Swiss-Prot record:
Residues 19-101 form the Lipoyl-binding domain. Gene3D superfamilies: 2.40.50.100. This is Glycine cleavage system H protein. Binds 1 lipoyl cofactor covalently. It holds the Pfam family GCV_H. GO terms for cellular component: cytosol; glycine cleavage complex. The glycine cleavage system catalyzes the degradation of glycine. The H protein shuttles the methylamine group of glycine from the P protein to the T protein.
Length: 122
């Protein structure tokens, strides 16, 4: 059973055991507008919490996506290479960005649950 968390930088995480799927929230993609390009980390990349890991580029602006946790990228969403608009259409499902390992479970305590995230975006 997976559990979903959110960051103040508008990323969502689905945690299932030691596997974490990361994406941008529906709110974030609305703020960005239509995405035209997504630059993802390479599989095998070791990320530190807070490190810029990906870039999402829209017709309005380019924005960094930060790693919400320490871990290693094990898979990227290859579908976004040809279809970056999946992030706009299905931000919190098929529009995920990368999957990574969970190295330090205590970092999850610093994340937001759904209610706290909804309060943040008001």
């Amino acid at each position: 059973m997976s559990k979903t968390y959110f960051t103040q930088d508008h990323e969502w995480l689905s945690v299932d055991g030691q596997m974490v799927t990361v994406g941008v929230t529906h709110y974030a993609q609305e703020q960005l507008g239509d995405l035209v390009f997504v630059d993802l980390p390479q599989s095998g990349t070791k990320l530190s919490k807070g490190e810029a890991a990906a870039v999402v580029e829209s017709v309005k602006a380019a924005s960094d996506v930060y790693s919400p946790l320490d871990g290693e990228v094990v898979e990227i969403n290859e579908a976004l290479t040809d279809n970056p608009e999946l992030v706009n259409q299905k931000a919190e499902t098929e529009g995920w960005l990368w999957k990574m390992t969970l190295q330090d479970e205590t970092q999850l305590e610093e994340l937001l649950d759904e209610d706290a995230y909804k309060a943040l975006i008001g």
